[in-house]
Amino acid sequence: MRTGVRALTTVAAAAIALALPTPAAQAGYLDELAVAHRGATTSTIAEGTMASYRYAVRHHADILDGDVRWAKDGADADSVGAMVISHDATLNRVTNCSGYLSNWLWSSIYKKCRTEVGGQRLIRLVDLLKYGKSVGKPFAIEIKASYITNAQARQLWYAINGYKVQLEAGYSALPSLNKIKKLDAADPNHKISYARITSGGGGWPSVATLKKTGTSVHANKSIPASVMRSYKAGGLKVYLFTGKNETDYARMAALRPYAVVVDDVGRFQRWRDAQS
């Protein structure tokens, strides 16, 4: 793995900056960190599975990225409903099951649902956290739900509080993220950091607006160079998403971000190594 660029599986923020790998000087063409998006998405590995995260770690991912949603409350051990790693609200695209994840018990998902690619089980947030900690990786976790109950907020906060986590949200999910921040503010020993996600739709948020959430921002790779410069000048750590191929990698690296979010860390590493 090259010194200048390492692969992350999500974003690390100011509160845990000292505990995370950092780019050499944030000046060179390839000095960005790389975030492994949902673990990995390849022709043989499905996103959000344990296989995808193991693949990311084998290819030197620095941060493990995932999205969290809640399964149905029921007879499972967790009375609030298990927190499942899933980008989609439904099981349709990734697995052989269908319907909203929130309508399924975790026990049923575990027994019945397998990914269309690779035939793997989905995993819970607690499974990802346990694995990541065992291999020394921090996390970037996105809240997808625009509304969560107070019980769900407490459940999520207790789950991630002992780990190096950057919690992220787009504009619609900020109310959910802010519930976590409120709980977190009362803990003097917290390790959680926070980041806003933006695709630039409706305009790029100002530095001041973004800093209301945290000192990091996840921005779509379509971000204009002028906006990128203003974010960096304003003290924001910019993570660009999502790199799917070599053309994307080159564009993202040219903007000299703090980190890049990529679907296939192995492919990104091969491209990066070929630049020398």
Question: Which residue ranges define each predicted feature?
Answer:
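Phosphate-group recognition and catalysis centered on beta-loop-alpha active-site segments
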Residues: R2-T10, A17-S276
